[in-house]
Amino acid sequence: MKGMDPMRITRIATLCLMVIPAVPGLVHAQAAAASSPKKIEVTVDAAQVSPPVSKYEYGMFIEHIRTLIYRSLWAEMLDDRKFYHPITSGGPKAPPGGVTRRFRMFLSRRWRPVGPDAFVVMDTEQPFVGEHSPRIDLDSSVPHGIRQGGLTLVGGKRYTGHIVLRGNSGARVKVSLVWGEGPNGRQTITIGALPVAYQEFPLRFTSRVGTSEGALEITGTGSGSFRIGAVSVMPADNVDGFRPDTIALLRRLHSGFWRLPGGNFVSDFNWYDSVGPRDKRPPILDHAWNAVQSNDVGMDEFMTLCKLIGTEPYITVNAGFGDAHSAAEEVEYMNGAVSTRLGALRARNGHPVPYHVKFWNIGNEPYGPWELGRTDLKYYVLKHNEFARAMRKVDPSIVLLASGAMPDEETIEGIASELHLKDYQVPFCSDADWTCGYLKHSWGLFDGITEHWYSRAGVRFDLEAAKKGKRYQGMEAGYVPVKQTVLQWVRKPSNRVHLKAEEWQEYERRFPGMIKKHIFMSNDEYAYTARGFREGPNLKLALAYAMVFNEMLRHTDFLRMTAFTMGVSTLDISPVAAVLNTNGLLFKLYGDHMGAGMLPVAVTGNSPQPLPEQHPFDGFPHTNAGSPTYPLDVVAALSPDRKHLTLSVVNATDSAVPLTLHVNGARVTGKTTLWKMTGKDLNAANRVGQSPQVQVKKVAVTEAGNVLSVPPISVDIYRFPVAPRPQ
């Protein structure tokens, strides 16, 4: 995940939520362009079949960005539960003004003293975990201790957990879950005599009422002092530590794989600290995002997450501050037999059966100036090669992916200018072309190459502006504002997929061995982003991502893996509930009907897409994304048994568009079924606690003949029963 100055593109909000605000003045879709023909025709050739859709087509990526994982997936209710931060009454106690509900829930909470600050001491003498543990000094009958507020509680819900304590025999400790004022606004557990050594005590609560201002208090009276090693509180219905609501929804999305750990975080990640008893894993400061990580969701928890969701893991190793030895040992921990040193450690941690993780990515965005441990390409390929050899020595069966960056990434994202190249433009196979660098210098030491892309709404890249160093609203040089129609807005991110495909085909031309060795591309980070954030994904964004999916399905010969940023951006989430948002609804729609094993077929038409207006490097791109059915976007595929033909049609205009369908190589033998995803307008969205504004409805198609009436502002999946045409 790219890093930027904190003031640029409301960074944390964009990365945590990947939400796109509505663009003022573009609430309604526009009519179809006048230049398109009155009668749009599409011809599907069922005899021209591409390789099947990979089971990894709709994968997910998530990063340890501040509290993102811990709010959305992990069920722990307490922040800093192992006390990295000093506990004082100072510092901000409320979120800054203007923070929306969705962003507010991702802000980290702090512990505060109960009573004067002087009675809470961060003691470095024999800490339970990390550098210190809080010591609470006591003063007879006046309670002293610590408190964390801002907890969301549900009335009647049970909560379980534990606390690790030690102290003097004269200390009397109470732990309270607080939901209101007075003695009736809390449930208190009295801990018995404290031992000299740290001991774990169970916690069980039931909240009588619901509140978003709940708290946990740990206080003591008596004489001497007591120390708190760690504390944990989760809803009792957690599933192996994870939220049951978000897990259940994510199981429905046919993700194929989840990439974790990954992102900028991984370049400062010590995987050794993320295994073993959770209470004893040290909390650390993640320097990539300048935030504390508890290490609670570590390597074994990631495997549990994948099992619960029903997907495969994909691990990125630390090639920033990390080394080949630790990466190889990480492979051994995950995949090694119990007879190996790290396999035995995994078994002692409760997981005797090897995980057999297949996909491994060496490094995250090593080309980026933002990446911790960055070095030049000529040195990094040496590092990659060392990592690859060491990791394959441990497990020769793993699939290794190199972290590439094509000329579009280097040019459009401003990386070349950051490196002070003489020419801002990055030609193919120049010293700044990382993807070509692997093809030249790491051949045989990777099976696939990763590519990341983030397309930005409301701006376009201009090479001349970039050369002059012009910056717009803190973005990299070269981005200039642009007025877009809705159709242009919706089509924009799919053009980035298409550009990646054109570049890949150029590499295949220069390096023919790529095809023979089945070298594949993985877009294992991608998103459509914009400045600011409001209320999250909507129908307009779903239309854009549908065109992204369609473009991905046109390149199944080499684009075999993709991972959406972020995986939980498919959900609308509150602290106590979650629903599929429009992103999630779209992933489910395509996973259900255009998923693994489907066979894309050739599509032609009579209405070409507009040509590119910009060619930032080497004349690329040559064409734009989409089918020749403008303003519609159409992709088609046969079912694995070839008994059904499925069409995905995206209509971002405000009118129904007639589409005349011709099928070659097969004949339609029965009634057509339509799954239609739409809403009342482009801002329609699905939110927690509200009736869904965007739905997928199964519709019987009544049109006679071969003309389909494609509904306005909709994503439409048509399925036709087919049989081979007689010869």
Give residue ranges: language-model regions.
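Carbohydrate-binding surface patches
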Residues: 627-668, 674, 716-719
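Aromatic/acidic polysaccharide-binding cleft in carbohydrate-active enzymes
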Residues: 56, 64-65, 265, 456, ...
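Solvent-exposed strand-to-loop "edge" motifs in beta-rich extracellular domains
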Residues: 164-168, 206-208, 592, 650-652, ...
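Noncatalytic carbohydrate-binding groove/subsite architecture in carbohydrate-active enzymes
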Residues: 214-218, 225, 334, 376-545, ...
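Conserved, mostly hydrophobic/aromatic
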Residues: 60, 163, 254, 306, ...
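Extracellular and organelle-lumenal recognition/adhesion modules and their flexible linkers in secreted
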Residues: 30-295, 312, 328, 378, ...
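Active-site groove signature of glycoside hydrolases
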Residues: 219-220, 261-262, 341-375, 402, ...
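Bacterial N-terminal signal peptides
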Residues: 13-25
